């Protein structure tokens, strides 16, 4: 057996590579997108609700 099969070589290479996440996660690690996600969603919903409510009597409608 002069040469190892290709799958065995690939498995050895994959096993020897470092992990993508080399630093352990802590409780303070929060992705930037989810940090302000709830605030942005609430602000958008509040704006849409206000537009819907005030457009009925046309006193403060910004659309059309």
Swiss-Prot record:
The keyword Methyltransferase does not apply. The modification Isoleucine amide is found at residue 63. Its main location: secreted. Residues 23-51 form a propeptide. Expressed by the venom duct. It comes from the Eukaryota. This is Conotoxin Ts-011. It comes from Conus tessulatus.
């Amino acid at each position: 057996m002069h040469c190892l099969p290709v799958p065995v070589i690939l498995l050895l290479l994959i096993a020897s590579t470092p992990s993508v996440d080399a630093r352990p996660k802590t409780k303070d690690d929060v992705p930037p997108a989810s940090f302000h996600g709830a605030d942005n969603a609430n602000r958008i919903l509040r704006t849409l609700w206000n537009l819907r409510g005030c457009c009925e009597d046309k006193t403060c409608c910004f659309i059309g």
